[in-house]
């Protein structure tokens, strides 16, 4: 599934740096409304990686009712991202723990479009512990309604913080 957002009045380089800063990741977690564990950031010669565990309740506003039926009352997930230094591409992985368990992997790209940066993430979600034929519906729901929503919040925070 393709997710698109625009981050206004900035450059690709500035967005790449912003997306892996501790203050930005904390602001993202706060905006999403999750409890986050320790945010870990590592920067080597090839890429910068960031990861953080999240926990949030599913009985709150903004979580679709279908999602509430399939997800546990409290969701535990791990958010991981990597941005290469050599080009404007990155990888995202979200692992949802519990039942159903799910892994969402994504390929992200940033491109300059005039004064703005277009942020595109293509994701795929796989679940386990969900009987057929519900698995595909749950994967689509997690991909669109959970991960897609988190990515839209990420862009909103980037527009505000950037």
Language-model segments: which ranges?
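Short, surface-exposed coil-to-beta transition loops
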Residues: 1-2, 74-79, 101-107
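Short, solvent-exposed secondary-structure boundary motifs
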Residues: 25-34, 68-74, 96-102
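Soluble, non-transmembrane catalytic domains of enzymes that act on hydrophobic metabolites at membranes
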Residues: 36-45, 94, 107, 116, ...
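A conserved amphipathic terminal alpha-helix motif
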Residues: 77-83, 134-162
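Short amphipathic alpha-helical segments
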Residues: 11-16, 20, 73, 138-149
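Hydrophobic ligand-binding cavity/cleft-lining segments
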Residues: 1-60
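Beta-strand/loop substructures that line and gate deep hydrophobic ligand-binding cavities in soluble
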Residues: 50-51, 82-83, 88-144
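Glycine-rich portal/gate segments that line the openings of hydrophobic small-molecule binding cavities
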Residues: 39-94
